[in-house]
Amino acid sequence: MAPAPFTGDSREVDPGACFDWLRQGWAMFLVNPGIWIGVTVLLLVILMAISIVPLFGQIAAHLLVPLFGAGMFRVCLRISDNEEPAIADLFAGFHHQAGQLVMVGVFFALGIFGIAFLAFLLVSGGVLGGVVTGKVAGFGVALGGVMLAGLLVMVLSVPIIMATWYAPALVFFHDMKPIDAMKASFAAGARNWLAMCIFGVFLVVALFFAMLPVGMGLLLLLPVFSGAVYASYRDIFMGS
């Protein structure tokens, strides 16, 4: 009898597990830093080249992120299975479940651009209200619109990020449908909200410092955090 399809059930882990995820991410990087740096350089070059194209490039980049994310997870899987990773693994998502991974990118892009549109409406409304109100009071109205827009973006981005955090891994490794994978990813993030918050804080701080030396820190940050996210996926969904 064929095994039951993967349902995306997740488990709750200790908040301190995020530190072990980071440790595992660092350990994966040390196994083969050359391949990791090569993969990261190639990824950054591709994304920067795509993003140069006005509007279309930004949309395309959002659609391709899940495919490249699956490729990074493929590198992680090879390392965890004591296999030799290759730079070509970055494109594994283009060969398996590519259409489903693109749909994850579509839903992600719709969410992000939808939030950006709402923020634009708030900012433009605040500026218009400021012009109508007058100089001093108008500045306060405009500033209030900008602050409200920023808060809205922060709050509404969280569920979208949660829904796409594990979706590429669930689609790529378990052939889940995009919507089901995003629901499972969101549920896992909500169930482990404290661990994810701590992990997110480390990511934001690390990203800040990684961008200081002309972004060179990304050559270390992206591999380590890819490994850490893979480790968290194994911990939360596979119990290993």
Describe the residue ranges of each PLM region.
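Hydrophobic alpha-helical membrane segments
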Residues: 1-240
